[in-house]
Amino acid sequence: MNIKVDINLAAVQIMWLFLMMKITLVGQSVWMIFELTVCMLCTIYVITNIKYVPRNALMLVIALAMSYLVSTLVNRECNGPWITYTGVEFTWKIILYFTVSWIAIKKRGSNNIAKASWNCLMLYWVPSIITVFAQGRNVIDNANNVYFIGNKFNVAYLNVVMLCLLLFLNNERKENCSRSFVLKINSKKIGVFLFYAVIVFIDYYMKAYTGLFMILFILILAILSRYLQFRIAKKWSGFLNFIGKPLIVTISVVASGLVAIILEAIMNIPTIGAYLASIGKTGNILSRTLIYKNLAEIIERKPLIGYGYGSAIVSRYFGPNAQNGLAQVMIYTGILGTFLMLLITFYCCKAGRQSKGSQSAAFLYAIYAFILSATVEITYGGTFFILLAFYCACGWEKKLSRGDMYE
């Protein structure tokens, strides 16, 4: 029996499985070979289908990738060969994250690509959940536990992506649907609600509270949008329209970086510092402010192009990284790379807004979840870029005719 492989679905699936996550049981050198092979295959796919990518979008992505590459190469002597290699590879991946997603969705449609993404990610999600329970729940923290695809943050962000894809695939409301509140219970919905409950419990069990916040944030917005819209239709539509504006999304990214400055300033107020110490709540807050105090000094030394992707410069002061998404991007790529990241965020959200549908809103909710989490974690990476690409392509899909979209 002949098995026909859809190259578009396969390209997205191998991108997810080999360029976004790593199986911890596989050795570093072996996985590196996998990554290089997949990068080359995806590059061939992109080159042969480059006509599907708008020129201005491609130029923006290449500019962002080059900012990472230049910073990495300039700092190669300080960072060493392995960090330099990682930075060069990430540069390559950035281009593929956007272009593979854009091409695949333009050729096969967002529903097919989302379904293919969901199916392949289940190959990682199921064993990850098994290893979470096998490891058990530590009394203090689960950050050092190693699961199927990494630590608790890797599993938590996978949960967020799975939730986003599930919401997208299960939002079948049409624009001319009645706005009355109808809740029909069937086996499919029971399965969906069960999945929601599982990922919420898993994040709580792992003590991945940032991931738990992201999931609850997305779920609340999705529930309000779908089931309560008939009561607050006008106000809610206005709110969604407001947060969907590309300028608002971009400003939100900037604001997520300002939290580092604000929190450090608040902790320097004697009364607040003494109160937090008296109730034993200085832990994570204090450790982050110790990092934030040194961020300005670190960035000022190389403000234009930064220290290169993967640089361990922050660890020389306090902590493994900047504990803030935008600050980490600025450390990696400087002002230039940060500006380009903001620019491509604006571009993708401007294109995505053209979809004007509740289905693609799942990607917008996820983007905001990553933005909010970036105030205390490093979330502006590959997953964030792919979500931007998916949301952007949904806007293009809505704009183009069916004949332009599908082969």
Predicted regions and their residues:
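N-terminal signal-anchor transmembrane segment
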Residues: 1-49, 63-78, 93, 127-135, ...
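Alpha-helical transmembrane segments of multi-pass inner-membrane proteins
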Residues: 111-138, 152-228
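Transmembrane alpha-helices of multi-pass inner-membrane enzymes
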Residues: 17, 164-168, 215, 219, ...
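Flexible juxtamembrane loops connecting transmembrane helices in multi-pass membrane enzymes
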Residues: 234-245, 257-290, 314, 406
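Aromatic-anchored transmembrane helix interface
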Residues: 36, 57-72, 79-105, 116
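Hydrophobic transmembrane alpha-helices and their immediate junctions
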Residues: 49, 55, 115, 332-370, ...
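A juxtamembrane structural motif centered on a specific transmembrane helix
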Residues: 1-10, 48-49, 177-183, 187, ...
